[in-house]
């Protein structure tokens, strides 16, 4: 028996709604039990979505924060996600994007979290938001091999890199005078951890070829 779609009409009659957290699929089902039309929810400022059942999310132009997990976009870039001058926080987990193209449409973004995005390979577009970006977290995005764009992110205050990708070096830290915290589990190929010494809080995974241990690094928060 196929259940009728859930009726979201009452939701659209709430013009003062600012926050919406929406999961439309059960673990044992392949299809959502309805579709939310975000073109009819123009005043939202914070949205959290998961999986299928989300229509017209790019119409959300007043968002300050957007979080998505298991979301599948057509373009496989940030063109599939909300953007705008007000957007400051973006968190994407297990999504199908391949690049960050389109991030320049959110020129005031401050905080970007990228987690378990298995198809993401190209983060070079980050230089387009270097002026605004303050915090960047990249975790378990194994296809990213080129982190050279980090040299352009001179206003970062917090940087977290988690995964098995080898960083050639961490010389990019010298270009981040405002950096307060740096944490990584990634192997650093040249083994030189001295750039960490200038950072108030730094954490690395100990490896035999590193010239410093994690315990040698500052832990001031």
What residue spans do the PLM features occupy?
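Concave beta-strand-loop units of leucine-rich repeat
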Residues: 1-12, 16-56, 62-99, 105-145, ...
């Amino acid at each position: 028996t196929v259940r009728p779609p859930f009726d979201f009409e009452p939701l659209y009659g709430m013009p003062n709604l600012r926050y919406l957290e929406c999961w439309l699929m059960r673990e044992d089902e392949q299809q959502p039990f309805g579709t939310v039309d975000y073109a009819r929810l123009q005043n939202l400022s914070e949205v959290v979505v998961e999986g299928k059942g989300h229509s017209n999310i790019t119409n959300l132009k007043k968002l300050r924060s957007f979080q998505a997990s298991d979301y599948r976009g057509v373009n496989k870039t940030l063109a599939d996600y909300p953007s705008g001058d007000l957007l400051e926080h973006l968190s994407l987990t297990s999504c199908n994007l391949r690049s960050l193209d389109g991030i320049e449409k959110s020129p005031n973004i401050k905080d970007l979290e990228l987690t378990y995005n298995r198809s993401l390979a190209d983060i070079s577009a980050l230089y387009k938001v270097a002026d605004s970006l303050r915090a960047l977290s990249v975790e378990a995005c194994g296809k990213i091999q080129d982190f050279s764009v980090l040299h352009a992110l001179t206003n970062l205050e917090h940087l977290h890199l988690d995964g098995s990708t080898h960083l050639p070096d961490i010389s990019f830290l010298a270009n981040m005078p405002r950096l307060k915290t740096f944490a990584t589990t990634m192997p650093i190929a040249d083994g030189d951890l001295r750039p960490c010494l200038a950072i108030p809080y730094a954490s690395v995974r100990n490896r035999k070829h590193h010239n410093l241990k994690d315990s040698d690094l500052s832990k001031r928060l």
